[in-house]
Amino acid sequence: MGDMQMSVVDPTWELLDPNPDIRALFLEFNDTFFWGQLSGVEVKWSARMTLCAGVCSYEGRGGLCSIRLSEPLLKLRPRKDLVETLLHEMIHALLFVTHNNKDHDSHGPEFCKHMERINGRTGANISVYHNFHDEVDEYRKHWWLCNGPCQKRKPYFGYVKRAMNRAPSSLDPWWADHQRTCGGSFVKVKEPENYPQKRKRKNDPTISEVNSSSHVKGKSNGVDIRTVIPFSGTGYKLFEPNKSDAPLKILNINPTKDKAAVPLLNHTPPSTNINGTFLTNKIGSAKSTPAQSILTKVSVANTKVFINLNGSPIKLPSGSKNKSHQISSKQKSVLPFFKMQKDNSFDLTLPSPSIQSTSQKPQKDISFGFTLPSQSFPSTSPGSNSENKEPLYKKLQMNDRESFIIHSGNKTNVNDNKSCTGPAATTASGLNHTIKVSCPVCGTEVLECKINDHLDTCTSSGPQKDILLDVSLPLQSFPSTSQGSNSAIKEPLYKKLQINDKDSFIIHSGNKTNVNDNKSCTRPAATTASGFNHTIKVCCPVCGTDVLQDKINDHLDTCLQNCNT
């Protein structure tokens, strides 16, 4: 048969592929007989079409062309009839998509030309009309008989047979002619077995409700999901104020019972802060106030009470709840230390030396809390009391990409009680007229009260987003951490720290080494080849523990790993 080894209508296909995939057949026939021009045509089964074996519909130029095959008729016929019906409809589709549909009756010369071409190549018997009359009559279960003269006329003898329960009416195109020539009325004489019972069962709301509930298993209408899927864990109930810090444990909630039943409260687990120390629950204590008994929601958004640790809310210690400057991921956390000017200048108000953290491991969203002696930092807010000796807690958040360490280079003796109790002369803004501070831009010593004007002059070239601060610190008070460095070098150590208006800073302070003491500044007591002192202890910025200076790097690595876990 040409280029094919076996005819598409060969009887062997009945055993090899009795139920073929019509989409696979369509693609194969499109490439073999129709030059691949039907790739945009749709082919599918139709479960309701019982009058004809196939239909090809076209929505016009550029529209959808669809082929539908009758599943009720073709499933009772041999495979050969399915193939011939599909080829028949594909010829119609070819005439549609190539705009060659000149045949007004759809089966004219153009159709017959392609039909004969395919029949000659395949040995098929594609015809104009099908002969599945027995199958069509099998699905016509609803019969009506006319009581007029037309019941004696050929070919129908007054019968109207249909597959659906639709009585003859004026909607039929032949109704007007029947009324004029016969004038009789139609009476239903036959319908499928048990059809009234099926119709009654379908229209009965009680039966349909029972059937719907029996068929759809596990589906609940208006029922709490917690009754279908029991929840035995702990959690917080949304949109309801919690009366305790403890998580709510929901047990056996039945929505049909009294609504006054509330979820049982599980025992309160001990909360921990970021340093790993346990915090006590003060609800119900003798010192609790009505405001404390009704707490806000447990959320990382409430930065006054909780901090964000890897997405989990951790309660802050009670001593830092009332502080106005709490943990923040933006630069608002360092505003108490630096007062931003309009031209990106800073008012540096930290006179104490600091110890540089040597750990360079990037940590994400880790908050450090450390205590700074308030005596060494005069308050910069208007109206604040300089005699306040309460420790100042500052919580600064360190980000892996936006973390900087600022070393203060002011040589004020932090152990001098006279200079710690209060400034010699302060203005209403809290600035001292006698203390000189070092300009972070040019390094010149300027009076503290005039540092802002001096910074404006230094940066008068124009607003800059990135400003480099040169902070000169004596090398002897801050031993170098690099291997093989010489501790006897007297040259000042300059650190370039870039300050961005969107970055956050970590300021390490609290080193009580007297920078004015020449003995301590000339040479450390005992140093190793790496520059660390074996006798000086430094405070860990993470947990606050005093650790030997040469052990601080290992201790910081351990603390940071514990924070992550």
Swiss-Prot record:
Bias type Polar residues, positions: 205-215, 351-361, 372-386
InterPro entries found in the cross-reference section: Rad18_UBZ4, Spartan, SprT-like_domain, SPRTN_ZBD
Name of a matching Pfam family: SprT-like
Amino acids binding Zn(2+) 2: 439, 442, 454, 458
Boundaries of every SprT-like domain copy: 23-130
Modification note: Autocatalytically cleaved in response to double-stranded DNA-binding: autocatalytic cleavage takes place in trans and leads to inactivation.
SMART domains: SprT, ZnF_Rad18
Positions of disulphide bridges: none
Region annotation Disordered: where it falls in the sequence: 191-219, 349-389
Cofactor: Zn(2+)
Binding sites annotated in the UniProt record for Zn(2+) 1: 88, 92, 107
GO CC, alphabetical: chromatin; nucleus
Short motif (SHP-box): ranges: 231-239
Enzyme class label: hydrolase
UniProt KW Ribonucleoprotein keyword: no
Annotated function: DNA-dependent metalloendopeptidase that mediates the proteolytic cleavage of covalent DNA-protein cross-links (DPCs) during DNA synthesis, thereby playing a key role in maintaining genomic integrity. DPCs are highly toxic DNA lesions that interfere with essential chromatin transactions, such as replication and transcription, and which are induced by reactive agents, such as UV light or formaldehyde. Associates with the DNA replication machinery and specifically removes DPCs during DNA synthesis.
Domain notes: The UBZ4-type zinc fingers mediate binding to 'Lys-48'- and 'Lys-63'-linked polyubiquitin.
Name of the protein described by the UniProt record: DNA-dependent metalloprotease SPRTN
